[in-house]
């Protein structure tokens, strides 16, 4: 579906924005410019065929996809060849930018929409990202499979669901001692207040909540860390759709 000639990648302005935003995050993105440019080209190529993302403009993609994804690196959680799950990856965010900048990570990108998974597979191939794979499926099903349950050191999700729902979807994937990061917008306090008892039921606890501003745009973001402290009881996650309809908190 995504074969063929790629349209042009990032413009000089787009590259400059990416470098400037990376600097604001403490990252030197110059060695990765070509990879991000190719990823942008793939997004543009696919946008006429598949509804991958509502963001189409170059600056929007650079700031709200690439740089937003890389805010994860403000947390000291990514050292070494960790196995990482990106749940609800969509067009590959935050997983693909994270893998570009931290190639040693072993990354599995999961989405429930087949066309989005096909795009991510194509991006992994074109970018030559070794140790990354895209997977179609629902969290409630995959988290019960032996190769996925309590099999990841880290998990990430960006704007997938409220924290009370997301915690039930993410924590079963984590090994004890692992950590998940929920990427949230400006208002997170109401979601945090009822969360601790639900996390305890799932074998977890609330870790750091890092408030930050998105480079260049100044938009408020929060990175919410969920720590895995004990095995998740076999009852979780519940059947597909149940966590959304009947959240634990």
Swiss-Prot record:
Region (RNA binding): 245-246
Residue sites binding S-adenosyl-L-methionine per the record: 88, 93, 111-113, 139-140, 158
Enzyme class, broadest EC rank: transferase
Known catalytic reactions: guanosine(527) in 16S rRNA + S-adenosyl-L-methionine = N(7)-methylguanosine(527) in 16S rRNA + S-adenosyl-L-homocysteine
Disulphide-bonded residues: 164-249
Location (main, coarse): cytoplasm
Keywords annotated in UniProt: Cytoplasm, Disulfide bond, Methyltransferase, rRNA processing, S-adenosyl-L-methionine, Transferase
Gene Ontology CC: one annotated term: cytosol
UniProt key word Transferase: yes
SUPFAM superfamilies for this protein: S-adenosyl-L-methionine-dependent methyltransferases
GO molecular function, one term: rRNA (guanine-N7-)-methyltransferase activity
UniProt entry tagged with the keyword Chloroplast: no
EC number, as in UniProt: 2.1.1.170
Protein task: Specifically methylates the N7 position of guanine in position 527 of 16S rRNA. Shows a marked preference for deproteinized 16S rRNA as substrate and is completely inactive with native 30S subunits as substrate.
Protein name per UniProt: Ribosomal RNA small subunit methyltransferase G
Organism encoding this protein: Thermus thermophilus (strain ATCC 27634 / DSM 579 / HB8)
């Amino acid at each position: 579906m995504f074969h063929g000639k790629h349209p042009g990648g990032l413009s000089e302005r787009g590259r400059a924005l990416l470098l400037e935003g990376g600097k604001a995050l403490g990252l030197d993105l110059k060695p990765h410019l070509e990879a991000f440019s190719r990823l942008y080209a793939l997004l543009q190529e696919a946008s006429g065929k598949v509804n991958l993302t509502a963001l189409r403009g170059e600056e929007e993609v650079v700031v709200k996809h690439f740089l937003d994804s890389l805010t994860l690196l403000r947390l000291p959680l990514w050292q070494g060849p960790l196995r990482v799950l990106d749940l609800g990856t969509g067009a590959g965010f935050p997983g693909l930018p994270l893998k570009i900048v931290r190639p040693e990570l072993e990354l599995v990108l999961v989405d429930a929409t087949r066309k989005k998974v096909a795009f991510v597979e194509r991006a992994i191939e074109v970018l030559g990202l070794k140790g990354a794979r895209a997977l179609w499926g629902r969290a409630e099903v995959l988290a019960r499979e032996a190769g996925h349950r309590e099999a990841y050191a880290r998990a990430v999700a960006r704007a997938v669901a409220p924290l009370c729902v997301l915690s039930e979807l993410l924590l079963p994937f984590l090994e004890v001692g692992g950590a998940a990061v929920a990427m949230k917008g400006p208002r997170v306090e109401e979601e945090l207040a009822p969360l601790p008892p639900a996390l305890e039921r799932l074998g977890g606890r609330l870790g750091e909540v890092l408030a930050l501003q998105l480079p260049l745009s100044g938009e408020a973001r929060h990175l919410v860390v969920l720590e895995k402290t004990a095995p998740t009881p076999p009852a979780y996650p519940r059947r597909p759709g149940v966590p959304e309809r009947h959240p634990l908190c």
